[in-house]
Every structure is written in C-alpha cells, then in structure tokens.
C-alpha cells in the first residue's frame, strides 16, 4: 500500500491480517531487549501515530503537537475526512492517513515509536494491544478498556512487552497528584473510611427513552462502519451512535462513571491503595434501561482493609440532582479553570458540581476533578492546619510530556496501565452493577464475582465479532 496524502483505504490489496506475524516477532524482541526509538536513537523526536483524530482524539493530537517532542507519522480514523477530523487534517495535511489501524501498522509499523488511542471506549483495546505487541508505546484515553478482562490483558501486555503505557486522565500529572501523595506520606490524609464522589453534569443520555437499538440509516461515505464497530457486536449504523453519542449505550461506552471516575477519585484510588472492591452495589438507579445508562445512579464500592488502612466505602453519585450529603462547612464546589469543559450540556454544565469529599481520621477534605487540589474543610480547620502541611512539589511535566519522557526512559508514567488498570477495573464492576441493577460480591484474589453468575459472565464483556478474536491472544 502507498500511504500517500490521499488516504490509504481499507479497499487496498494489501492483506490486513499479516499484522499477526509481525506483531509476534516484534513483541518477542521487545520482551528481551530495550527497544530504541525508530525515529532517532540518539534521543530526538518520537515518531507518533494517532488513532482517532476527531473530537477528543483531535484534542489529544494537539496536546502532543504543543510539546514539540513528536513527529506525526500517521493518522488513523474510521471516519477520516468527516467534519470533526478536518481541524487536525488542515493543520497537518502531509501526514499519511488511514481508516484501518491494522493497515497502518502493516504499512508504517517500522517507523512508529508510539501510538495515541483517542477512539470510542470500546475500541481502545484492539488498537492498544496490537501496538504493545509490536513494541510500541501507548497513550490511551480513559478508561483503558471496556471490560474487566480487556483491562487485565492490557496490564499484562504492558508488562510482557516492556513498553511505556499511559492512560490519559491528564489530572494525574497535576497538582492533586503531588498533593495527595505528599499528604498521605505525611499522615495528613490518614485512615480514610469513606469517599463520596459526584458528577452531576448533564450527560447525553439524560432525557433519552429507548426500547431497543436505533434503526438502520445509510452509512456516510466517509465512514468505515465495520471498522468503527471494532470488537463490538454487530449493529446497524445510526448517527445516534456517533460523535460521542456512543457514551450513552452499554454496548459502546462506560457511562458517567467510566468517563469521569478516573478524573475524580484516581489519586485516592492510587495513594490509598484501594485495589479492587469486595462488594459493589447499585444503591439507586433512576430510569434504568437495559440499553442505555440510568438517568441517575448511586453506587457503593466497598473495599477491604489494606495494610493498616481501614475498610473504605466509595460512594458514586451521577445524575442532575443526585447529590451526596455534604458535610458542614463544605461551602461551594471546587472550581479549577484548568478543568476542560464537559462534552455535553453547554454552559449550564459548567455550573453543575463535580468532585469528591474524603472523610479521614480527624480531617475532611473536598476536591474537584482532574488536577484540582484538595481543600481541608471547614475553613477554620484549614487555617489551623496550614502551618503543619507538608510542602508539595511542582509537577516536572504535564501528562503527555511525562509519557513522552517515559518513552525515552527519562520518567515513569504516572498513570501507567499497572496503576490505572485496577482503577478502570473497579469502574467496570460499577458498570456491571448498573447494567444488571444489582449488588454482588467480588473476590479480588480470584478476579471473580462469587454470588451472581450473570454478573460474573459480564467480566469478560461480550464476545468479539468474528475476525476480531485475535486481539485477545496477543
């Protein structure tokens, strides 16, 4: 295939399945030897391929462009040329284009050092797995994968192929990361028994009422619908699944929890060493549907005691008016101008609260999302504690620079798959509780749901479509 400026297309004569042989051979060498960057072994720019270049994927492209540390060697999007991809294509008109990531690797794999994955949640897994199996570093938007099993395989691949793999919850390189770490190490945050996390902004499915999947519509000429479906089960095309609308559907997305949980309780999960819960409960679901996410959800994740830390209950609240009880002295929500706007809801969404309350021994904290720093509440207690707080270091790098430096062996990924994986698996368990409107026990030692066979079966997700099974064996 010739990846000239007119897009390399899925209709090319090059066989797309030849990637397996290359994946296995590249993976074997990556396992035993440190891999030099293809672009410049002396330490120059990193050759970057970007999968998903519209909407959030396009924002990721621009974040990497700002670093000045990358060469874009390939763009891949199943809807290449659609309006939401034109911004990136206009800025970088000479970068080779593909609709199919498998053809991209077949054609340009030797030139690629690292890959971004900014596609819908359900399609993260095959792209990331193929990239890692070929020794490519991976920056993957959150959540890592859609099912518990997918996430486990992605963590295993990170270890097996010895690559830098970062999940794109960018606040994990912000002020809250370094503050939470310093506060826990100094004993300021200690013996936490409860966290209330809330995301009460409008979501795309709010107000939706469906009694099945959407009716078939003509596929736009720019879109490769079978490749967009990726590992998902067969569905007829409908524009109601596109451009972020997929987030509404269990078959494609992970709801408000999967979209925002990694921005709200990520640091608590890491530094309180939460791991995986022993019990998950759908406490309240408003407007439950077997197809789309509830209009409002209250979920409880109950974590066992951990090495001197007490049992902890993480309560999750989403929905426009589904707020947690707030402690005295809470005041207003934490507002951080660096937090990106929500993808739906317009200006009103900016006014809706998002954040957390952390109940520790002797102190209570409130925080927002992404990198927003915690505040001790009430304010009188904050003033009393001010002189006793440890110094919090500045971040040496933002999230994408941290990843790029990790590709070069200069830093470690702050949200590596090893760190982000159990967080994403916890959220995937919450989605199972939502989908079945149930409560279940989970055994972290075996990775199985012990008292609900239907829920346990969902740990693996739905079987992949024919022709997509191989990504589970890489």
Which functions belong to the PLM regions below?
Residues 179, 191, 196-202, 206-418, ...:
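Contiguous beta-strand/loop segments that form the cofactor/metal-binding neighborhood of enzyme cores
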Residues 22-92, 171-174, 268:
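N-terminal Rossmann-like dinucleotide-binding module
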Residues 137-139, 145-227:
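A contiguous active-site-proximal alpha/beta segment in oxidoreductase catalytic domains
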Residues 5-27:
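N-terminal secretory signal peptides and thylakoid transit peptides that target proteins
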Residues 54, 79, 95-153:
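Beta-loop-alpha module in the N-terminal Rossmann-like domain of NAD(P)-dependent dehydrogenases
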Residues 73, 113, 193:
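Conserved acidic residues
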Residues 59-64, 84-88, 125-130, 150-151, ...:
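Short, solvent-exposed loop/turn and secondary-structure capping segments
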Residues 79-82, 98, 118-123, 144-146, ...:
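Short, solvent-exposed turn/loop segments enriched in Gly/Ser/Thr/Pro and often Arg
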């Amino acid at each position: 295939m010739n990846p000239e400026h007119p897009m390399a297309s899925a209709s090319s004569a090059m066989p797309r399945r030849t990637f397996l042989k290359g994946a296995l051979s590249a993976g074997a060498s990556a396992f035993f030897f440190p891999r030099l960057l293809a672009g410049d072994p002396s330490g120059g720019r990193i050759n970057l391929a970007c999968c998903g270049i519209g909407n959030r994927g396009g924002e990721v492209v621009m974040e990497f462009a700002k670093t000045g540390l990358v060469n874009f060697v390939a763009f891949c999007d199943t809807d290449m040329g659609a309006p939401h991809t034109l911004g990136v294509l206009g800025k970088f008109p000479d970068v080779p284009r593909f609709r199919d990531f498998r053809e991209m690797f077949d054609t340009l794999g030797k030139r690629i050092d690292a890959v971004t994955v900014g596609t819908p949640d359900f399609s993260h897994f095959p792209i990331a797995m193929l990239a890692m199996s070929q020794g490519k570093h991976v920056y993957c938007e959150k959540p890592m994968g859609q099912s518990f099993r997918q996430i486990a395989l992605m963590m295993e691949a990170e270890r097996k192929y010895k690559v830098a793999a970062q999940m794109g919850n960018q606040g994990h390189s912000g002020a809250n990361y370094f503050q939470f770490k310093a506060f826990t190490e100094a004993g300021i945050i200690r013996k936490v028994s409860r966290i209330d996390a809330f995301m009460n902004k409008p979501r795309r499915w709010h107000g939706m009422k469906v009694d099945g999947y959407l009716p078939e519509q003509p596929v736009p000429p720019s879109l490769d619908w079978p490749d967009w479906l990726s590992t998902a089960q067969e569905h007829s095309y409908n524009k109601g699944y596109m451009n972020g609308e997929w987030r509404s559907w269990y078959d494609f997305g992970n709801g408000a929890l999967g979209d925002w949980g990694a921005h709200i309780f990520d640091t608590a999960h890491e530094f309180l060493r939460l791991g995986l819960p022993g019990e998950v409960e759908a406490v309240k679901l408003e407007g439950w549907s077997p197809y789309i996410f509830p209009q409002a959800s209250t979920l409880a994740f109950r974590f066992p005691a951990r090495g001197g830390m007490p049992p902890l209950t993480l309560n999750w609240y989403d929905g426009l008016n589904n707020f947690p009880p707030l402690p005295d002295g809470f005041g207003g929500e934490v507002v951080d101008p660096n937090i990106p706007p929500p993808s739906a809801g317009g200006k009103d969404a900016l006014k809706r609260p998002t954040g957390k309350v952390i109940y520790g021994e002797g102190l209570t904290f409130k925080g927002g999302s992404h990198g927003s720093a915690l505040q001790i509440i009430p304010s009188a207690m904050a003033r009393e504690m001010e002189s006793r707080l440890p110094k919090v270091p500045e971040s040496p790098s933002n999230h994408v620079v941290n990843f790029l430096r990790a590709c070069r062996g200069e830093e470690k990924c702050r949200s590596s798959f090893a760190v982000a994986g159990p967080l994403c698996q916890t959220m995937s368990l919450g989605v199972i509780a939502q989908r079945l409107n149930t409560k279940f026990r989970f055994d972290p030692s075996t990775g199985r749901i012990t008292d609900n066979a239907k829920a346990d079966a969902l740990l693996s997700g739905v079987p992949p479509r024919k022709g997509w099974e191989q990504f589970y064996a890489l």
